[in-house]
UniProtKB/Swiss-Prot annotation:
Recorded GO CC terms: cytoplasm
Complexes and interactors: Homodimer.
Function: Catalyzes the phosphorylation of pantothenate (Pan), the first step in CoA biosynthesis.
UniProtKB keywords: ATP-binding, Coenzyme A biosynthesis, Cytoplasm, Kinase, Metal-binding, Nucleotide-binding, Potassium, Transferase
Essential cofactor(s): NH4(+); K(+)
Localization per record: Cytoplasm
Active site as annotated: D102 (proton acceptor)
Lineage: Bacteria, Pseudomonadati, Pseudomonadota, Gammaproteobacteria, Pseudomonadales
Family note: Belongs to the type III pantothenate kinase family.
One MF annotation (Gene Ontology) recorded for this entry: pantothenate kinase activity
GO biological process: coenzyme A biosynthetic process
Amino-acid positions noted as binding ATP in the UniProt annotation, renumbered to this chain: D6, C7, G8, N9, S10, F11, I12, K13, T125
Name the record gives this protein: Type III pantothenate kinase
Amino acid sequence: MILELDCGNSFIKWRVIHVADAVIEGGGIVDSDQALVAEVAALASVRLTGCRIVSVRSEEETDALCALIAQAFAVQARVAHPVREMAGVRNGYDDYQRLGMDRWLAALGAFHLAKGACLVIDLGTAAKADFVSADGEHLGGYICPGMPLMRSQLRTHTRRIRYDDASAERALNSLSPGRSTVEAVERGCVLMLQGFAYTQLEQARVLWGEEFTVFLTGGDAPLVREALPQARVVPDLVFVGLAMACPLD
């Protein structure tokens, strides 16, 4: 079995899959390396034969995680690294090594699934969008604060905005104008996300008309799902690209 890891800015998304058919044995989201090891170790009858990682962490943090995995499960982790071109997709950055690996792998996965022009909208800690043309040219993209960052900034820099996570969840039952601070903040942030997504969709239409596929991924993708009914929701899109970048037998 293979352990796949997507190490983001705030959390680690993980899953264990069977080598032969990629059937998922288990998975989850954790907030620390130690929690990751504990959750994977708790899976019954799992014997890992490999591990592959995509990380936007520092090199030192990623190396430390690889060492921990080697110690806990006796496997050497393969870490995805930036390249100028792979699987028919050409990196669109002037300095290709500066493109975040999560964005690069999501673009690879999307192009592989779409077999043509595609727009990737990834809504996590940051909201990201990337455009890939029908001939595999990565045309660049956009990054702005995602829901967690918008919420955090308002809570941190506005003294009278204070509420708990349960209140935030209840506030999202509707997007009508808020009648409390928590409703106003949470719904306003969702509308910001939806506006970001709409703008990317219009950009794609200018480029390609209607001849493209939209992919939604990331933990907050459900918040814009109704606004983009034509989009394909692929929660593990980065893992699709990771398997292409780091094949394991």
